[in-house]
Amino acid sequence: MDAKIAIILGATRGIGRALPAILGAALGSEAVIYVTARTDADAERLATELTHEGVPARGLPFDLADPAAPARVASILRERHGGVDIVIQNGAYMPRSGISAAEDARPMIATNSHGTLRVLRSFLPILRPDGRLIIVASSMGLLRNLPEHLRARFDTTQAAPDAINSVMDSYVSAVESGTAAAEGWPDWVNYPSKVGQVAVTRAFARWAKQAGALPAGALINAACPGVTLTDATRDFMGTVFKPEDAQTPEQAALGLAQLALLPAGTAEPYGELVRHGKVLRFGD
């Protein structure tokens, strides 16, 4: 059996840092687990740390905010290995405490919505049969977090991925022009951002299957790790999140690994948002 190739996009901290050890233990010493950081030096440092911990890791630089990064990294994996078995997109632009939506909306949507679609488009062509392509998102991305009149804009049974991102661009324009509240968008930018991220993943998964672009047995899903205490969420504990509900990064990573390691021949879940093995219905 060929050695498994996995990549974790965004692996320096929190859940991303906890994932390599879990995947390494499951995939064995012959596997290659790529971990990314924003700079080459940080990626190599991370890979060295993981290697000392017994993880078969290699480092690559990757920044989700760089439009060229997904295609560049996918090209490297194609050249070195011919394909990839597991892709976990864990990187994201996180809301910043004390920063207004007008400042955060454009970079957040550019990264989380458009960046997610670039990852999906770049890595699907090199995904091996029975491969797993996972976008780490959140239950904040469920339609229940939007008012009813906005939900039809995210009809992932019909809309193309680019159409979803056009909706997100219109949201950014509304925020910057000061009309977002009147249009009914939530005050906190993370809700629309995550809805867009989950919706574009669902729309892309539907397209991939309908277009015959999906490798045999491959699965594309979004994943909700659940509330997790990390550097990115610490400022929101006690306000947005309940500290008593928070997991450790290691606990959250187990749920993501479970989705990534579903055995060959598994047909579902597909095109869903999954939290610790349970499908969270997008429209509920």
Describe the role of every protein-language-model region.
Residues L9, V84-M94, R132-S138, N221-A222:
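Rossmann-fold scaffold of SDR-type NAD(P)-dependent oxidoreductases
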Residues T12-R13:
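Conserved glycine-rich cofactor-binding loop
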Residues L27-R45:
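Conserved glycine-rich Rossmann-like NAD(P)H-binding loop of the short-chain dehydrogenase/reductase
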Residues S97-A110:
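Short alpha-helical oligomerization interface
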Residues R118, A222, T230, G238-D284:
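C-terminal helical subdomain
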